[in-house]
């Protein structure tokens, strides 16, 4: 299994079902993978939610890739969440958790 930014049901199930779960960070990365994106349902449709890479290079190992964690990316993710879930139960609590989780100290963060 390679690192993923977003936890999803299949990943959690595989972790729970395994005796030993190994995350590989010494493999090559691919640009259109799920390392930095995931499909999110809401507002009657599915959309890709992506945290962009900074200076992505295919030949780099996953452990050497960085995600763009700038303020503009943070705002984009929060606005994405607001536009799809503002009418959902527990919206305010979930938004608070999201904002806290996105409180990065750097403009780029290592994927691993």
Listing of model-derived features with the role each one plays in the protein:
Residues 1-112:
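Residues lining hydrophobic/aromatic ligand-binding pockets adjacent to catalytic sites
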């Amino acid at each position: 299994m390679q690192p993923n930014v977003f936890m999803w049901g299949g990943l959690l199930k595989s972790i729970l079902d395994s005796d030993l779960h190994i995350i590989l960070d010494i493999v090559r990365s691919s640009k259109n993978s799920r390392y930095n994106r995931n499909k999110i349902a809401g507002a009657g449709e599915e959309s890709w939610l992506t945290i962009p890479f900074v200076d992505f290079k295919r030949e780099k190992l996953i452990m050497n890739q960085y995600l763009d964690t700038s303020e503009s990316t943070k705002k984009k993710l929060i606005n994405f969440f607001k536009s799809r879930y503002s009418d959902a139960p527990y919206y305010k609590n979930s938004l608070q958790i999201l904002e806290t989780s996105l409180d990065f100290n750097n403009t780029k963060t290592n994927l691993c």
